[in-house]
Design a protein with these regions (language model features):
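Conserved NAD+-utilizing ADP-ribose enzyme module
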Residues: 2, 9-66, 91-93, 102-115, ...
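An acidic/histidine-cluster motif and surrounding catalytic segment
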Residues: 61-86, 92
Length: 192
């Protein structure tokens, strides 16, 4: 299956992409482990992470408070493991793809280039081959809504949105992301 990926400041001319190349699992793992112990433990970890993250931002060691995104990823992974055991691809151990090059260009622009945070030299557009049986299409709108809910500390809503995401439901205006944890091969570095 031919898919398209944009890589922000991490692609190194390798013949393949690493699942979880950004190492996001290690940040979501404390929230996942806490959920395995119970909701009260999760809440304690969440509020502790809030405090520590704010300290790191104040000290200039982090640009922003990422703990909320990490908590959402932890909740999504917990829901996948406990309620959707048949879903083999984890958001934390995969590569994210787009179905078309144009879509990948748009995502790259919206996520990395529009605000001037990165240059076109730092954001690589790639054509990649990956096994079709390891690729799953989800509506990212549920994930985006979950990030908004966690900003309001509405953890229950995040669980509900994770369930819709993994049940393959679609919003009225779906924003499709394709996750794959299969072996892959970079076929071409595209130009803008």
């Amino acid at each position: 299956m031919i898919l398209f990926h944009y890589s922000v400041d991490s692609y190194t001319d390798s013949p393949s992409l690493t699942n979880d190349c950004a190492g996001h699992y290690k940040y979501a793992e404390p929230f996942l482990l806490a959920l395995e112990r119970g909701r009260q433990v999760f809440d304690a970890v969440f509020y502790s992470a809030m405090y520590a993250s704010r300290d790191l931002v104040d000290l200039g060691l982090r640009k922003n408070e990422n703990y909320r995104k990490d908590a959402v990823e932890g909740i999504f992974e917990y829901v996948r493991r406990t309620e959707f055991a048949g879903v083999p691809v984890s958001r934390l151990h995969c590569v994210y793809y787009c179905a078309s090059l144009e879509e990948a260009r748009k995502y790259a622009y919206d996520d990395a280039l529009a605000d001037g945070g990165f240059t076109k030299e730092q954001v690589k557009l790639l054509t990649v081959e990956t096994p079709e049986e390891r690729a799953y299409a989800y509506d990212q709108q549920f994930y985006n809504a979950a990030k908004e809910e966690i900003d309001k500390n509405n953890v229950d809503a995040v669980f509900a949105l994770a369930r819709k995401y993994f049940a393959l439901e679609r919003t009225e205006s779906p924003l499709i992301e394709i996750l794959s944890d299969g072996e892959n091969r970079v076929l071409k570095v595209e130009t803008y």
